[in-house]
Amino acid sequence: MTAVETLGKLFAGPGAHDYLGEPVTIGEHMRQAGALAQAAGAERAIVAAALLHDIGHLRGEGDDGSRGGSGGSSRGASSAGDRHGEAGARWLSQWFGGAVTEPVRLHVAAKRYLCATEPGYLGLLSAEPVRTLVWQGGPMKPDERAAFEALPHARDAVAVRRWDDAAKDPAVAPPGFGHFAPLLAALVRA
């Protein structure tokens, strides 16, 4: 099975499940995020990262520590609560380079960063991201912010995070996974 077929199977199976109390399925959420990135004119790798940002959840690797995930990182961007980002990026790295995997890995850290640096951001979040923020480490401290800002893909992770936050609209019918398949196929490493 190719990378794109494997991903498509996840979107068709677990992607049809409820998404942590949100009004859309996890697959709809991820496809909405990819569509928002595409509509914003993001580079192909960033569209892929937005589409795949919660792939760790689709694979059952949640922030509660189930099915692996690394409990942290020496890079200053991780906490014990971002396992789905870490696990998803690690799994995706068998096919994609860092331009796709790093924003996936860092999208939880980006939430913590935005909570620390952007007044009012926390108030924009739905209930589940606010709840998980506590065990993801809370808003970043100054040293964590500096470490995050120094990461090569931090800006892309913040963009993915914003699309992640906006991609929960039950009135929006996102394109199907097949819409993104050619983009993903073009990004798969040979």
PLM segments and residue spans:
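Metal-dependent phosphohydrolase cores
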Residues: M1-A190
